[in-house]
């Protein structure tokens, strides 16, 4: 049932984007875009776009931007949706205490973070393997795009789900702890905004400590948001415009990048950027109302 619900939620909008991009590329795309699309389409259909970019040595931070470049993150997400339920069921059968299971999962997250640090500090670029499939792979591409290195943040959240259950500890919205949690949540969001604004994704510090820090800050924000006593932070996160944007965030993400590439809004043109934003919002709203919600 979980997999079926995920398919109903994710597949229709994704395949609509793939169809629209394919039609545009066939009619108006450059020869390079058409060539890239023939390669990327299959990877994207089966939610392995991230591995297609890694193994195909498609430079994520250089060269002409592929129309489907952004689908790497959805590939990581879907691979997690496929594998994690199986791991979760296996963990339940162990019958270990929740705090032991959660602690072990969080420890696994920090193993991944340590692996990222080691890989960036000690391994050559391009990579030399093993496995043989990674021979010649760009190190930065692998660190940024691979499911292996991105598993750290996912494991962090999964482990916390075993441990953090504040609604069982208190139901009092005026609990004194709220006076501590509200500024903690706000600080986490502010720091995430700063990280997104100043990070240069090709720099080593991103993989040595910034991505792990972003994962931890994101987890802190979520942990505060689900605590009954964090009334102020919960009220901000429940602000209607934010909620409505969140409902449409999947479509906004899917449509924004190809529209920005097609409108040529990635080159610094203000007018093109404005047109791309208007088109993205309009198409995403149509996708949400007439495709995502009905299904």
Regions found by a protein language model. Give the residues of each.
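Membrane-interface helix/loop caps of multi-pass membrane proteins
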Residues: 1-295
């Amino acid at each position: 049932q979980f997999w079926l619900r995920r398919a109903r939620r994710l597949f229709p909008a994704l395949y609509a984007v793939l169809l629209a991009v394919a039609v545009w590329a066939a009619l108006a795309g450059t020869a390079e875009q058409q060539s890239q699309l023939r390669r990327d389409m299959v990877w994207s259909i089966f939610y392995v776009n991230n591995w297609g970019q890694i193994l195909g040595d498609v430079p994520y931070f250089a060269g002409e931007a592929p129309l489907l470049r952004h689908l790497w993150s959805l590939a990581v997400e879907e691979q997690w949706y496929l594998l994690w339920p199986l791991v979760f069921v296996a963990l339940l059968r162990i019958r270990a205490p929740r705090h032991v299971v959660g602690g072990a999962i969080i420890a696994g997250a920090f193993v991944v973070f340590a692996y990222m640090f080691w890989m960036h500090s000690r391994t050559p670029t391009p990579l030399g393997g093993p496995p043989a499939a990674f021979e010649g792979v760009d190190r930065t591409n692998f660190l940024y795009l691979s499911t292996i290195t991105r598993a750290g943040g996912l494991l962090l959240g999964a482990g916390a789900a075993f441990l953090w259950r504040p609604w069982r500890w208190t139901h009092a919205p005026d609990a004194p702890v709220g006076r501590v949690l509200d500024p903690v949540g706000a600080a986490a969001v502010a720091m995430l905004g700063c990280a997104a604004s100043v990070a240069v994704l090709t720099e080593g510090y991103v993989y040595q400590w910034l991505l792990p820090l972003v994962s931890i800050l994101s987890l802190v924000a979520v942990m505060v948001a689900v605590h009954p006593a964090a009334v102020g932070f919960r009220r901000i996160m429940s602000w209607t415009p934010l909620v409505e944007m969140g409902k449409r965030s999947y479509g906004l993400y899917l449509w924004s990048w190809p529209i920005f590439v097609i409108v040529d809004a990635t080159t610094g043109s203000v007018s093109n950027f404005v047109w791309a934003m208007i088109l993205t919002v309009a198409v995403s709203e149509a996708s949400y109302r007439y495709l995502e919600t009905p299904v």
